[in-house]
Amino acid sequence: MSANEQWDIVSGVGITALAVAVARARESRRDDRLIDDPYAEPLIRAAQPPVPMSGDGGEAGALWHEMTDYVSVRSRFFDEWFARACAAGTRQAVVLASGLDTRAFRLEWPEGFRVFEIDQPKVLEFKDGTLAAEGVRASCERHAVAVDLRDDWASALVKAGFDPALPTAWLAEGLLPYLPPEAEANLLATVHDLSARGSRIAIESIALARSALLGADLDDTAREWGIDLKGLFSLEDRPDPGDVLAQRGWRVHRDPVGDLAAGFRRPLSDRAQQLGAAGEMVTAQRD
Protein backbone atom coordinates (compact mmCIF):
# COMPACT_ATOMS: atom_id res chain seq x y z
CA MET A 1 0.00 0.00 0.00
CA SER A 2 1.52 3.31 -1.07
CA ALA A 3 1.82 6.23 1.31
CA ASN A 4 -0.90 8.38 -0.27
CA GLU A 5 -3.10 5.74 -1.86
CA GLN A 6 -6.86 6.26 -1.62
CA TRP A 7 -9.51 3.65 -2.36
CA ASP A 8 -13.19 2.83 -2.46
CA ILE A 9 -14.85 -0.54 -1.89
CA VAL A 10 -13.96 -2.05 -5.28
CA SER A 11 -10.35 -0.89 -5.54
CA GLY A 12 -7.13 -1.14 -3.58
CA VAL A 13 -7.41 -2.32 0.00
CA GLY A 14 -11.17 -1.71 -0.20
CA ILE A 15 -11.74 -4.80 -2.32
CA THR A 16 -10.26 -6.97 0.43
CA ALA A 17 -13.01 -5.68 2.75
CA LEU A 18 -15.52 -6.75 0.11
CA ALA A 19 -13.89 -10.19 -0.03
CA VAL A 20 -14.27 -10.55 3.74
CA ALA A 21 -17.95 -9.61 3.40
CA VAL A 22 -18.31 -12.39 0.80
CA ALA A 23 -16.79 -14.82 3.30
CA ARG A 24 -19.20 -13.68 6.02
CA ALA A 25 -22.15 -14.06 3.67
CA ARG A 26 -21.04 -17.58 2.72
CA GLU A 27 -20.68 -18.51 6.38
CA SER A 28 -24.08 -17.07 7.27
CA ARG A 29 -25.75 -19.51 4.87
CA ARG A 30 -24.38 -22.54 6.74
CA ASP A 31 -26.51 -24.47 9.22
CA ASP A 32 -23.50 -24.73 11.53
CA ARG A 33 -22.45 -21.11 11.05
CA LEU A 34 -20.08 -19.51 13.51
CA ILE A 35 -21.46 -16.03 12.80
CA ASP A 36 -24.68 -14.63 11.38
CA ASP A 37 -24.26 -11.50 9.30
CA PRO A 38 -27.52 -10.66 7.49
CA TYR A 39 -26.02 -7.43 6.17
CA ALA A 40 -23.07 -8.85 4.25
CA GLU A 41 -25.21 -9.92 1.27
CA PRO A 42 -26.79 -6.47 0.68
CA LEU A 43 -23.35 -4.87 0.82
CA ILE A 44 -22.00 -7.30 -1.77
CA ARG A 45 -24.95 -6.68 -4.11
CA ALA A 46 -24.60 -2.92 -3.84
CA ALA A 47 -20.85 -2.95 -4.44
CA GLN A 48 -21.13 -4.28 -8.00
CA PRO A 49 -17.46 -5.32 -8.22
CA PRO A 50 -15.88 -5.17 -11.69
CA VAL A 51 -15.49 -8.98 -11.64
CA PRO A 52 -17.75 -11.55 -9.92
CA MET A 53 -16.64 -12.57 -6.43
CA SER A 54 -18.70 -15.73 -6.18
CA GLY A 55 -15.98 -17.87 -4.68
CA ASP A 56 -17.12 -20.88 -6.71
CA GLY A 57 -15.19 -23.25 -8.92
CA GLY A 58 -11.57 -24.14 -9.59
CA GLU A 59 -8.50 -23.56 -7.49
CA ALA A 60 -9.62 -20.05 -6.58
CA GLY A 61 -12.92 -21.54 -5.39
CA ALA A 62 -11.06 -23.85 -3.02
CA LEU A 63 -9.16 -20.87 -1.66
CA TRP A 64 -12.48 -19.06 -1.13
CA HIS A 65 -13.74 -22.00 0.93
CA GLU A 66 -10.64 -21.93 3.10
CA MET A 67 -10.79 -18.16 3.42
CA THR A 68 -14.40 -18.43 4.60
CA ASP A 69 -13.40 -20.85 7.35
CA TYR A 70 -10.57 -18.58 8.48
CA VAL A 71 -12.66 -15.40 8.40
CA SER A 72 -15.45 -17.13 10.32
CA VAL A 73 -13.12 -18.31 13.07
CA ARG A 74 -11.57 -14.86 13.29
CA SER A 75 -14.93 -13.08 13.34
CA ARG A 76 -16.40 -15.38 15.99
CA PHE A 77 -13.37 -14.89 18.22
CA PHE A 78 -13.60 -11.11 18.02
CA ASP A 79 -17.38 -11.19 18.51
CA GLU A 80 -16.90 -13.09 21.76
CA TRP A 81 -14.07 -10.77 22.77
CA PHE A 82 -16.37 -7.77 22.41
CA ALA A 83 -18.99 -9.54 24.54
CA ARG A 84 -16.43 -10.04 27.30
CA ALA A 85 -15.37 -6.40 27.08
CA CYS A 86 -18.98 -5.30 27.50
CA ALA A 87 -19.46 -7.66 30.44
CA ALA A 88 -16.40 -6.10 32.08
CA GLY A 89 -18.01 -2.66 31.89
CA THR A 90 -16.40 -1.19 28.78
CA ARG A 91 -18.76 1.29 27.13
CA GLN A 92 -16.91 2.48 24.03
CA ALA A 93 -15.12 0.70 21.20
CA VAL A 94 -13.02 1.75 18.22
CA VAL A 95 -12.86 -0.37 15.07
CA LEU A 96 -9.70 0.59 13.20
CA ALA A 97 -10.03 0.38 9.40
CA SER A 98 -13.57 -0.91 9.83
CA GLY A 99 -14.22 -1.59 6.15
CA LEU A 100 -17.54 -3.41 5.78
CA ASP A 101 -17.60 -4.56 9.40
CA THR A 102 -21.22 -4.75 10.60
CA ARG A 103 -20.79 -5.43 14.32
CA ALA A 104 -22.33 -2.06 15.17
CA PHE A 105 -25.50 -3.38 13.51
CA ARG A 106 -25.52 -7.16 14.07
CA LEU A 107 -24.26 -7.51 17.66
CA GLU A 108 -26.17 -6.76 20.85
CA TRP A 109 -24.64 -3.88 22.78
CA PRO A 110 -25.37 -2.45 26.25
CA GLU A 111 -27.57 0.61 26.30
CA GLY A 112 -25.56 3.73 25.52
CA PHE A 113 -22.58 1.82 24.15
CA ARG A 114 -20.62 3.82 21.57
CA VAL A 115 -18.84 2.28 18.57
CA PHE A 116 -16.46 4.46 16.56
CA GLU A 117 -15.63 3.16 13.08
CA ILE A 118 -12.55 4.62 11.39
CA ASP A 119 -11.95 4.23 7.66
CA GLN A 120 -11.55 5.98 4.33
CA PRO A 121 -14.44 8.36 3.50
CA LYS A 122 -15.58 6.47 0.39
CA VAL A 123 -15.70 3.17 2.25
CA LEU A 124 -17.82 4.56 5.07
CA GLU A 125 -20.07 6.45 2.66
CA PHE A 126 -20.76 3.25 0.75
CA LYS A 127 -21.55 1.21 3.85
CA ASP A 128 -23.68 3.91 5.47
CA GLY A 129 -25.66 4.56 2.29
CA THR A 130 -26.25 0.89 1.53
CA LEU A 131 -27.43 -0.07 5.00
CA ALA A 132 -29.59 3.05 5.29
CA ALA A 133 -31.30 2.14 2.01
CA GLU A 134 -31.98 -1.31 3.48
CA GLY A 135 -33.58 0.28 6.54
CA VAL A 136 -30.88 -1.09 8.83
CA ARG A 137 -30.20 0.75 12.08
CA ALA A 138 -27.24 0.40 14.40
CA SER A 139 -27.78 -1.47 17.67
CA CYS A 140 -25.50 0.98 19.48
CA GLU A 141 -24.53 4.64 19.34
CA ARG A 142 -22.44 4.45 16.19
CA HIS A 143 -20.02 7.12 14.98
CA ALA A 144 -18.45 6.92 11.51
CA VAL A 145 -15.06 8.67 11.57
CA ALA A 146 -13.98 9.31 7.98
CA VAL A 147 -10.22 9.69 8.18
CA ASP A 148 -7.14 7.91 6.86
CA LEU A 149 -5.20 6.08 9.57
CA ARG A 150 -2.03 7.56 8.03
CA ASP A 151 -3.33 11.05 8.92
CA ASP A 152 -4.16 12.63 12.31
CA TRP A 153 -6.92 10.15 13.09
CA ALA A 154 -6.63 10.66 16.85
CA SER A 155 -7.87 14.26 16.61
CA ALA A 156 -10.71 13.20 14.31
CA LEU A 157 -11.69 10.46 16.75
CA VAL A 158 -11.82 12.80 19.74
CA LYS A 159 -13.74 15.36 17.68
CA ALA A 160 -16.32 12.65 16.92
CA GLY A 161 -16.98 12.21 20.64
CA PHE A 162 -14.44 9.62 21.73
CA ASP A 163 -13.50 10.00 25.41
CA PRO A 164 -9.87 9.00 26.13
CA ALA A 165 -10.61 9.09 29.86
CA LEU A 166 -12.85 6.02 29.55
CA PRO A 167 -11.74 2.40 29.04
CA THR A 168 -11.89 1.46 25.37
CA ALA A 169 -12.10 -1.77 23.39
CA TRP A 170 -9.89 -1.39 20.30
CA LEU A 171 -10.10 -3.76 17.33
CA ALA A 172 -7.43 -4.15 14.63
CA GLU A 173 -8.86 -6.91 12.45
CA GLY A 174 -7.35 -7.47 9.01
CA LEU A 175 -5.35 -4.26 9.29
CA LEU A 176 -1.71 -4.74 10.23
CA PRO A 177 -0.72 -6.78 7.13
CA TYR A 178 -1.30 -3.66 5.01
CA LEU A 179 0.65 -1.21 7.16
CA PRO A 180 4.35 -0.44 6.70
CA PRO A 181 6.40 -0.92 9.89
CA GLU A 182 6.51 2.79 10.75
CA ALA A 183 2.76 3.18 10.31
CA GLU A 184 2.12 0.14 12.50
CA ALA A 185 4.41 1.49 15.21
CA ASN A 186 2.66 4.88 15.10
CA LEU A 187 -0.75 3.22 15.27
CA LEU A 188 0.10 1.20 18.38
CA ALA A 189 1.69 4.24 20.02
CA THR A 190 -1.42 6.32 19.37
CA VAL A 191 -3.71 3.60 20.70
CA HIS A 192 -1.60 3.47 23.86
CA ASP A 193 -1.73 7.24 24.29
CA LEU A 194 -5.53 7.26 23.92
CA SER A 195 -6.15 4.31 26.24
CA ALA A 196 -7.27 4.79 29.82
CA ARG A 197 -6.57 2.13 32.43
CA GLY A 198 -8.84 -0.84 31.82
CA SER A 199 -8.69 -0.47 28.05
CA ARG A 200 -8.16 -3.55 25.91
CA ILE A 201 -7.20 -4.31 22.34
CA ALA A 202 -7.64 -7.26 19.99
CA ILE A 203 -5.28 -7.67 17.03
CA GLU A 204 -5.07 -10.12 14.16
CA SER A 205 -1.34 -10.74 13.94
CA ILE A 206 0.19 -12.68 11.05
CA ALA A 207 3.66 -11.17 11.23
CA LEU A 208 5.32 -14.58 11.18
CA ALA A 209 3.21 -15.79 8.26
CA ARG A 210 3.84 -12.93 5.84
CA SER A 211 5.87 -15.06 3.44
CA ALA A 212 2.87 -17.37 3.01
CA LEU A 213 0.97 -14.46 1.50
CA LEU A 214 3.18 -14.69 -1.57
CA GLY A 215 2.07 -18.19 -2.65
CA ALA A 216 0.62 -19.21 -6.00
CA ASP A 217 -2.86 -19.57 -4.49
CA LEU A 218 -2.96 -15.83 -3.94
CA ASP A 219 -2.05 -15.38 -7.61
CA ASP A 220 -5.17 -17.33 -8.62
CA THR A 221 -7.40 -15.06 -6.57
CA ALA A 222 -5.58 -11.94 -7.79
CA ARG A 223 -6.25 -12.93 -11.39
CA GLU A 224 -9.90 -13.61 -10.58
CA TRP A 225 -10.33 -10.18 -9.01
CA GLY A 226 -8.08 -8.34 -11.46
CA ILE A 227 -6.02 -6.68 -8.74
CA ASP A 228 -2.43 -6.91 -7.51
CA LEU A 229 -3.10 -8.40 -4.09
CA LYS A 230 0.56 -8.90 -3.28
CA GLY A 231 1.16 -5.21 -3.83
CA LEU A 232 -1.33 -4.40 -1.07
CA PHE A 233 0.59 -6.21 1.67
CA SER A 234 3.53 -4.76 3.56
CA LEU A 235 6.08 -7.55 3.94
CA GLU A 236 8.87 -5.70 5.75
CA ASP A 237 10.01 -7.07 9.10
CA ARG A 238 8.69 -5.30 12.18
CA PRO A 239 8.43 -5.93 15.94
CA ASP A 240 5.68 -8.25 17.11
CA PRO A 241 2.65 -6.11 18.14
CA GLY A 242 2.14 -8.12 21.31
CA ASP A 243 5.74 -7.50 22.34
CA VAL A 244 5.32 -3.79 21.60
CA LEU A 245 2.28 -3.59 23.87
CA ALA A 246 3.93 -5.65 26.60
CA GLN A 247 6.86 -3.23 26.63
CA ARG A 248 4.35 -0.44 27.25
CA GLY A 249 2.89 -2.27 30.25
CA TRP A 250 -0.06 -4.06 28.66
CA ARG A 251 -0.96 -7.59 29.80
CA VAL A 252 -0.81 -9.70 26.62
CA HIS A 253 -2.46 -13.01 25.70
CA ARG A 254 -2.05 -14.96 22.47
CA ASP A 255 -4.43 -17.43 20.82
CA PRO A 256 -2.99 -19.39 17.87
CA VAL A 257 -5.42 -19.53 14.95
CA GLY A 258 -5.24 -23.32 14.75
CA ASP A 259 -6.25 -23.68 18.41
CA LEU A 260 -9.20 -21.33 17.95
CA ALA A 261 -10.38 -23.22 14.87
CA ALA A 262 -10.25 -26.51 16.75
CA GLY A 263 -12.13 -24.98 19.67
CA PHE A 264 -14.91 -23.81 17.35
CA ARG A 265 -14.97 -27.25 15.69
CA ARG A 266 -13.99 -25.68 12.40
CA PRO A 267 -10.56 -27.21 11.73
CA LEU A 268 -8.68 -25.43 8.98
CA SER A 269 -7.39 -27.19 5.87
CA ASP A 270 -3.70 -27.96 5.47
CA ARG A 271 -3.33 -24.97 3.15
CA ALA A 272 -5.16 -22.64 5.51
CA GLN A 273 -3.11 -24.01 8.38
CA GLN A 274 0.06 -23.18 6.45
CA LEU A 275 -1.06 -19.58 6.23
CA GLY A 276 -2.53 -19.38 9.72
CA ALA A 277 -0.17 -21.62 11.68
CA ALA A 278 2.16 -18.74 12.49
CA GLY A 279 -0.76 -16.35 12.90
CA GLU A 280 -2.48 -15.58 16.16
CA MET A 281 -5.06 -13.37 17.73
CA VAL A 282 -3.35 -11.07 20.20
CA THR A 283 -5.42 -9.55 22.99
CA ALA A 284 -4.08 -7.19 25.61
CA GLN A 285 -5.33 -5.13 28.52
CA ARG A 286 -3.90 -2.01 30.09
CA ASP A 287 -4.18 -2.41 33.86
UniProtKB/Swiss-Prot annotation:
Keywords: Methyltransferase, S-adenosyl-L-methionine, Transferase
Catalytic activity, EC: 2.1.1.-
GO biological process: methylation
Source organism superkingdom: Bacteria
Gene3D superfamilies in the record: Vaccinia Virus protein VP39
Top enzyme class: transferase
Keyword Transferase: yes
Pfam families registered for this protein in UniProt: LCM
Entry's Gene Ontology molecular function annotations: methyltransferase activity
Binding sites annotated in the UniProt record for S-adenosyl-L-methionine: D119, D148, L149
Alphabetized NCBIfam families for the sequence: mthyl_TIGR00027 (TIGR00027)
Similarity comment text for this entry: Belongs to the UPF0677 family.
Chain's role: Exhibits S-adenosyl-L-methionine-dependent methyltransferase activity.
Protein name: Putative S-adenosyl-L-methionine-dependent methyltransferase SACE_1742
Organism: Saccharopolyspora erythraea (strain ATCC 11635 / DSM 40517 / JCM 4748 / NBRC 13426 / NCIMB 8594 / NRRL 2338)
Lineage of the organism: Bacteria, Bacillati, Actinomycetota, Actinomycetes, Pseudonocardiales
